[in-house]
Regions:
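Beta-strand-enriched cores of mature, soluble protein domains
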Residues: 1-149
């Protein structure tokens, strides 16, 4: 199997799917990008530069199972040809407070459950490190390692 690595910054919105607010539907998109990390000045710094071209899309259902714990499942489409992966949470995700009182900070790991197109038969794991505002605005940083058939 061949390995494929991807890193993208998705931006979008999460909205309540029930009255209690314990289920959210997230819809995000990510332009092509270049991510550079350097340690030239002795201080690690990262830069994300967006580029032109087709955008990746992300749709998920988030179900809270506690004050800070959640389960998630969804689809990430990584091409304009419909090549996509279905994923679900490994263990549970975490969403809590951050040093910035305007945003919550969370993380989650997903397993790839299935794929379509070039991702047919794919397996792998994806990590997500994200921020959410009180209005449901989401900035989500993905790093995935996918094994392609």
């Amino acid at each position: 199997m061949r390995q494929m690595v991807y890193a993208l910054q998705f931006i979008g919105k999460a909205v309540p799917a029930n009255e209690a607010g314990t289920v959210l539907n997230a819809s995000l998109s990510a332009p092509q990008c270049t991510i550079t990390t350097s340690n030239d000045s002795g201080a690690c710094e990262g830069v994300i530069r967006t580029g032109a071209g087709p955008q990746a899309t992300f749709e998920s259902k988030v179900t809270f199972i506690g004050d800070t714990a959640f389960q998630e499942e969804g689809t990430i489409t990584l091409s304009d040809k419909g090549d996509s992966i279905r994923f679900s949470t490994v263990g549970q995700g975490y969403l809590g407070t951050s040093a910035d009182p305007k945003v919550k900070h969370g993380c989650v790991a997903w397993r790839i459950d299935s794929g379509k197109g070039r991702f047919e038969g794919a397996t792998g794991l994806i990590t997500s490190n994200f921020l959410v505002t009180a209005d449901g605005e989401v900035t989500d940083h993905h790093f995935g390692l996918i094994f392609l058939k």
